[in-house]
Amino acid sequence: MINMRKTHPLLKIINHSFIDLPAPSNISAWWNFGSLLGVCLIIQILTGLFLAMHYTSDTLTAFSSVAHICRDVNHGWLLRNLHANGASMFFMCLFLHVGRGIYYGSYLYKETWNIGVILLLTVMATAFVGYVLPWGQMSFWGATVITNLLSAIPYIGTTLAEWIWGGFAVDKATLTRFFAFHFILPFIIMALAIVHLLFLHETGSNNPSGINPDSDKIPFHPYYTIKDALGFMFLLLTLLLLALFSPDLLGDPDNFSPANPLNTPPHIKPEWYFLFAYAILRSIPNKLGGVLALLASILILLIIPLLHTANQRSMMFRPVSQTLFWILTANLITLTWIGGQPVEQPFIIIGQLASMLYFMLILILMPLAGLFENYMLKPKW
């Protein structure tokens, strides 16, 4: 009798995706982040669902409903801490996942890569609207500053901003619709993640060498299921350490004060995972220019496949490109640091230089490095 998992209409799909899937034999721990992101998404949806049962999306009661969750709901404090720090873990895994894709040339699977960039944008949108929900000072002012950027769009900007606010400023209508968005978007992310996997399984996984691995494949189960399980343990351990020992480490103290439209915090800044983009936004002393730079800093990922000039796919055997990649990594860490600093010297000039270097590395230096490495590999005799 043929195994049921190979014949049953539903089990067959799961089997082809997670059990009998042929996978390269040499993929490293950098390939664990896809499954870790799946676990993060499930954790966020489950904790978020239970939080939504007790949260009220009204300006008068939102802040106190979050306090009520933490004080009065059974294990509400744990749900809230897991959800807030789960977002940080989500972005940590996302950035490492994207970094892996750039380093090993995975972006040459264009459909998978483009869906991935759309996923990144959707997750960023979800995190932004979610941060507004507790209705603390930084929630309110973060929402005000970021949605206000829409007014920089010529001609339709102000109308667009007011349409999103549901009034003339961030208020009750804004909070209600942001809660609706925050509830629906994770399910859209889940659907997109399935499409992401669908495109990936059309081509099969890339591997560290960047060479076609078809001649040496192994079944996903048990080899990579057990490897993923180890990753899950590390992820859950880190998340629990964060949520149980220092739940407010990555948050902003201003968010412990209820939103007050009459009192602006001294330093308005988003959560740590948006600081690199915020630094790029602030580095241009023009509203529209800053908004365009902010968009470009993320959308630039879409043109990375077009900028691939090297004859080799992976950076594994390309030392010049490797050096530039790690400079880019250091540059992004620098931008993250600058985004959390006040707008004064020397932070302004450091932010401007780091922003310029970010675009130069991706658009000019890395493609040139690829061409240089091609030249160096050509026989000279």
Curated annotation (Swiss-Prot):
Predominant location: mitochondrion
GO molecular function: metal ion binding; ubiquinol-cytochrome-c reductase activity
Binding site for heme b b566: H97, H196
Keyword Metal-binding in record: yes
Listed cofactors: heme b
Residues holding a ubiquinone: H201
Family label: Belongs to the cytochrome b family.
Protein name: Cytochrome b
Gene source species: Dasyurus viverrinus
